[in-house]
C-alpha cells in the first residue's frame, strides 16, 4: 500500500475517533512513515519545521496581537455605536447593526471565531433584550461572522499565499473586499426579510447630524486600521509582514492613548492569549506541511491534474466539482488545515486548466469558511451556541435562510470572477 493511501486512510480514522485536527495530521504522517517504510522519520521534523520557517508567516502572530490589543481597548462598544447610528432606527435595526459591526470588526480580527465570541456575543444579548428571538440572533451572528476570514487582514489569506506561490498576500487582501461586502449585503437582505415577517422593531430614533459626526469621529481610528494596512502595502511603504507590525503599534496607540481603555496591567494577559493562539496556528501549519509533503512526493497533485485533463473538464465544470468537494470537506475540517492540505494539490490543477489564481483562492477560502456554519459539525456553530446559550438544534433551524443566501453568494463568486480579481488587478496586484 502506498504512503499516500495510508496517509489518507489514517487521517480519516484519527478524525473519526475525535483526535484534534493538528494531531490527526501529525499522527497520520507518522503512521504513513512507519507502515510504508519509504521515508525516514526525520521527514516529519524536517518538513514540520520547514512549514513554519517562513518570513511571510511572521505576520500571523502580529495580526493576532493587533486584534487582541484593539479588543482590549473596548473597540467593540465603539463599533457597535458607530454601526447602530446608521441602521439601528430601521425595522430590524439591531440585526443590521450586528452585520455592520461584525463586518467592521472583521477588518481588525481576521477571525470568524473572534467575531462571534467578541462583538457577536454582545449583539446577541442586545437583540434578545430588544425582543428578537435569541436563536435568530445567534444564527445571524454565526452567519455574519464568517466574513472574518474574507475581509482583510485575514490569517487564512496569509496561509493561502504561503501554500500557493501564484498569489500574493496583498492581492488576496484586496480580493476579499468585494466578496466580504457582498456577504454582508446578503445577510442584511435576510435580516430585512425575517424582520418584516416577524415584525422586529427599530431601536429608537435616528441620531442628529452632530451626534453622528461625534460617533464617527470616535470610531474613525479603528476603521482606519484596514485602510492603513492595504494603503501602505499598495503604496509600497511596507510588506504584509511589516504591515502586521505597524498594525500592532497602531492598535497599541488606539487602545492606550486614543480610547484610553487599555491598561498596561492587561498587556501580559493579551500577550499570553496571543501566544497561545499563535502556537495553535503554527502547530496546525507545521503538521499540515509534513502531511502535504507526502502527498506531493507521491505525485498526488500531478495525478489529479492528469486525471482531470483526461476527462476533459473545462474550468467551469471543474469549479462546480470543487465547490461540492470543498463544502463537504469544510464541514469536517477547519479552514486553516484545509488550506494547508488542499491548496498545494488543487491550486496547480486549477492553474493548469485556466482558472485565475486569485479567483480560485477566493472560491476555496469562502467554501472552507462556509463549512464552519454548515451542520452538523460546523465549528462556528458550537462557539455561537456556547456564547448565546442557544441549543444547537434551535440554532440550526434558524440558519436555513442564511445558508441559502450564502449559497447564492457562492454561485456569484464562482461564475463571476471579476468579483474576486477585478479590484486586485485594477490596483496592480498579480
PLM-predicted stretches and their roles:
Residues 1-430:
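Alpha-helical transmembrane segments of multi-pass membrane transport proteins
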Amino acid at each position: 500500500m502506498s504512503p499516500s493511501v495510508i496517509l489518507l486512510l489514517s487521517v480519516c480514522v484519527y478524525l473519526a475517533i475525535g483526535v484534534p485536527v493538528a494531531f490527526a495530521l501529525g499522527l497520520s504522517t507518522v503512521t504513513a512513515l512507519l507502515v510504508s517504510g519509504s521515508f525516514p522519520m526525520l521527514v516529519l521534523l524536517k518538513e514540520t519545521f520547514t512549514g513554519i520557517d517562513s518570513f511571510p508567516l511572521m505576520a500571523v502572530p502580529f495580526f493576532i496581537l493587533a486584534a487582541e490589543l484593539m479588543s482590549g481597548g473596548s473597540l467593540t462598544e465603539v463599533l457597535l455605536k458607530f454601526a447602530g447610528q446608521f441602521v439601528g432606527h430601521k425595522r430590524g435595526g439591531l440585526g443590521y447593526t450586528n452585520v455592520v459591526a461584525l463586518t467592521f470588526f472583521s477588518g481588525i480580527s481576521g477571525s470568524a471565531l473572534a467575531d462571534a465570541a467578541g462583538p457577536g456575543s454582545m449583539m446577541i444579548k442586545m437583540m434578545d433584550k430588544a425582543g428578537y428571538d435569541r436563536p435568530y440572533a445567534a444564527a445571524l451572528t454565526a452567519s455574519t461572522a464568517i466574513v472574518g476570514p474574507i475581509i482583510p487582514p485575514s490569517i487564512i489569506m496569509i496561509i493561502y499565499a504561503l501554500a500557493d506561490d501564484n498569489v500574493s498576500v496583498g492581492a488576496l487582501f484586496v480580493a476579499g473586499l468585494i466578496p466580504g461586502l457582498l456577504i454582508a449585503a446578503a445577510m442584511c437582505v435576510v435580516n430585512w426579510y425575517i424582520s418584516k415577517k416577524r415584525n422586529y422593531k427599530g431601536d429608537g430614533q435616528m441620531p442628529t447630524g452632530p451626534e453622528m459626526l461625534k460617533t464617527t469621529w470616535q470610531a474613525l481610528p479603528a476603521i482606519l486600521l484596514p485602510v492603513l494596512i492595504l494603503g501602505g502595502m499598495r503604496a509600497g511603504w511596507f510588506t504584509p509582514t511589516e504591515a502586521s507590525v505597524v498594525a500592532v503599534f497602531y492598535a497599541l496607540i488606539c487602545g492606550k492613548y486614543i480610547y484610553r481603555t487599555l491598561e498596561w496591567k492587561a498587556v501580559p494577559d493579551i500577550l499570553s492569549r496571543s501566544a497561545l493562539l499563535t502556537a495553535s496556528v503554527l502547530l496546525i501549519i507545521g503538521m499540515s506541511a509534513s502531511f502535504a509533503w507526502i502527498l506531493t512526493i507521491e505525485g498526488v497533485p500531478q495525478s489529479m491534474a492528469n486525471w482531470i485533463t483526461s476527462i476533459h473538464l473545462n474550468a467551469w465544470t471543474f469549479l462546480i466539482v470543487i465547490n461540492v468537494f470543498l463544502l463537504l470537506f469544510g464541514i469536517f475540517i477547519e479552514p486553516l488545515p484545509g488550506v494547508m492540505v488542499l491548496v498545494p494539490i488543487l491550486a496547480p490543477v486549477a492553474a493548469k486548466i485556466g482558472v485565475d489564481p486569485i479567483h480560485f483562492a477566493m472560491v476555496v477560502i469562502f467554501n472552507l469558511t462556509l463549512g464552519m456554519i454548515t451542520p452538523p459539525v460546523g465549528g462556528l456553530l458550537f462557539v455561537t451556541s456556547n456564547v448565546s446559550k442557544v441549543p444547537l438544534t434551535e440554532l440550526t433551524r434558524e440558519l436555513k435562510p442564511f445558508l441559502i443566501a450564502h449559497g447564492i453568494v457562492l454561485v456569484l463568486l464562482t461564475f463571476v470572477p471579476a468579483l474576486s480579481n477585478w479590484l486586485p488587478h485594477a490596483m496592480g496586484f498579480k
